[in-house]
Amino acid sequence: MTTIQLAVPEEASSRIRLGADLLKRSLLDIGLTIHEIGALTLAEYRNIAGIKLVIGNRLDHAFIRELEEHEVLLYHTNAPEGEGFYLASLPGNLIVIAGGSDTGVLYGCQELATIIAEKGGLPQELAFGDAPDMKLRGPVVPLQLTKVEPPRRTYEYPITPGRFPWFYDRALWLEYLDRLLEYRCNVVYIWTGHPFSSLVRLDSYPEAMEVTEAEFEQNVDTFRWLAEECDRRGIWLVLKFYNIHIPLPFAEKHKLDLHQPKPLPITSDYYIQSISTFIRTFPNVGLMVCLGEALQGALYGVEWFNETILVGVNEGLKDLKLKELPPIIVRAHAIPSEKVMEAAIPNYGNLFTEAKYNGESLTTFTPRGNWQDTHQHLSSLGSIHLFNVHILANLEPFRFGAPSFIQKCVQAAKYRLGCNGIHLYPLFYWDWPYSPDSVTPRLKQLERDWIWFAAWFRYAWKPDHHPALEREYWIGQFAKRYGSREAGEAVLDAYEESGECAPKLLRRFGITEGNRQTMSLGMTMSQLTNPDRYGPWKELWESQAPQGERLNLYVEREVRGEPHIGETPLDIADNVDAHAKNAERAIERARPYVVQNMEEFERIAIDVKAIALMTRSYTFKARAAIQILTYKLLSGQEFLNHVELLEAAIPAFEESLHNYRELAKLTDETYLYANSMQTPQRKVPFPDGEKFGHWRDCLPHYEQEFHSFTARVKELRNGDLPGGVASEERVGTYAQAEFVLHSSDAQTYVVDKQSKLFSDGNVLASNVAEELVGLTGIRINRDQASKEGVSIDIELKEPSRILVGYFNSKDSEWLQVPSLEENTHADDRGGLSPVIKNGLKVFFYPSVNVHAFLYEPGRHTLVFGQGSYLIVGVIKATQKMTVRDLEGASSLDTLDWLYENGKA
């Protein structure tokens, strides 16, 4: 029996020892014996009989350095650095695994162990070097739940066994971490709202702890163990937190809101102490910082990050002697992070930036526009820049595993965006670790979506494998799972074809790439033909899609006989229909050859069918929408003209509904829900992600929509204008609510034509909507608001809506409407969409849209952010408000009355 003489450094780190264990296991599996020996030298290693296997970090391994210096060990690739490694067979029966770091040694041992397992023996000739292209590579693990826990808000969940039993399951973690090592991940990002109240105890702020003493001890023990297990696999554990979030009991004691928009001395001190204590307790854990959403990052991001967060980090590190500084990652989310990084880079030596890839969906491998500019700028700042594959709201809840699409996305991140690291969300984020399949026991996402993780991390290591070789690789991976090459090839084809559908559908027809849209649940005809009503996010088609046309632009060009530019709605409809059909054929082609894992194969087949039905429900509805929009253009407001176009829309509209019915039926027993975020933040197709979380919940509304449409078309064909169309309702002034203005630097005024709108300057209203005339508005200082932001102290006597006017301009002097794409809490008080578009005209300035935000009785400090705005009234919350536009399209022109019970 052959004996391998294995030389492991006596002072080897846990990473190198783990690599040695992987090697030992592979050698024992092929029947070899292992004898561990001490350090070798160039002069004496030949005196030891048999095969010698030496592993070590070339930076501090004396024998490897000696081999290099005497040119016995030469590299035909780059000499290994960092996580790189080199495998070499050398004279005298010597095999060397040289790593550029301890992690490089681990990966080299892993590589040789894999070769041994595949070949069934030690290769005679070895000369192979490898290193990752991307600096950080890893997945997100969320400590989040699908529903909010009032009075806490979104993201806020203390870490307890009752909320997250899986977090304490060490066997589950070990399985997960071993898989990440298999994929050569070197980071795992744990996402929370405010973790410090569950992981650190502060003598100065005992009220900040949100868990019991027993839970705290369990948390610290679990987290320390987890950090150590990550470290021995070469994985950084990174903890994410939002700013400025504070613990509920801390907020209650100090009478503060849970989410703070600007730094206060007490919140800054609390964070400095929390972070420094955390660093001392868990020295090998990094931090990921979200400076947007609650914090007004444009105003206070630089101050908060540099004067609070980095102060806390450096305070925690000052007495520690670490070989590597923990990574600190700054999210470029709802904040111009360039200024933050410019100030921070001199203050810390291991900084990263991160930004979303395709927003909160997956839409294209050719990102462009503003978002491309943002990535490229961040990647030029001198720190490492990561791309974040985030939420995947358009892929939920189905399986996605199109390796060629994923490979091109990673290449785009590298070459188009300048990224050098990946931050990967699971496919069903909010319900981790479970998948949404209706299966008992519930499936784990790590197993169900194995190809999702495997493909992204394969290409994060090396993006540029040849496509033909990659096809063979993935056929082999599927063949192992389903028992034959024929099955592997066909299942791969099904994944590739079905994987094209959701990205293309969303980028051409969607309202947003943000997580307020659950794409698999469909879209209403109003959302397709009148998207402005639903706050469309233009970055979807201007940054996260190839050049092309939205439905309305396509119809306008078609009617005018103008040439089309880029991909059109009909291009995409025909294209994804073909992809869906090809996927259905491929999965059936696989069926006779599947000899193992039949249950999972059948679940994949159901997903392929579901994606095809979803696709056809979109494409036929889009074809109907083209007819309806053509009617809108040609008829003007002569609604009895060109009714034949509406009639022509009915067959496609009905076919869309038929496919949706089949989809609801198919998923009724196979899926628990469609969307992992079951909160009011989900708005499209219907408000409230909990109430409308399944296709069966949405189907009655789509049935009613089609019924209303056919009824309206019949009335129009008979020469009758539906009720509400013949005459629009008159509007009157809103009912004012009583309030007290406590701010000394603001003034009340009566809203009317010629009213002075700001306390400084002479900005006057030239026209005012009837609803607003006579209301009591509040004047602020325009210059101060545009440069610094202002706060308004107001006391309400009853439930009220505060009417905020946003100027229709993207110039930085004007406050911008909050968006759910950038702030999950943007619609907590309603008012995300305007109630009166162009409700005020202002001499020499842009027109003003009026939004209505709901507030409870009591005293409030209004802090909306940097930029000038108007407050044009405080009204009773109970009254009905009719949405309308004083300029351009009226509520009739939108044609929503065609689908919504005939009401304008």
Predicted regions and their residues:
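A short beta-strand element within beta-rich, extracytoplasmic domains
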Residues: 798-810
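Catalytic-core regions of glycoside hydrolase
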Residues: 28, 42-43, 166, 186, ...
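Short, well-ordered secondary-structure micro-motifs within conserved domains or adaptor modules
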Residues: 37-74
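Contiguous ligand/interfacial binding patches
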Residues: 814-882
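Feature activates predominantly on carbohydrate-active enzymes
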Residues: 2-5, 11-15, 19-22, 26, ...
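C-terminal non-catalytic alpha-helical accessory regions
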Residues: 426, 430, 438-687, 691-694, ...
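Extracellular and analogous surface-interaction loops
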Residues: 782-784, 790-801, 850-859
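Glycan-recognition and processing domains
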Residues: 728-786, 889-902
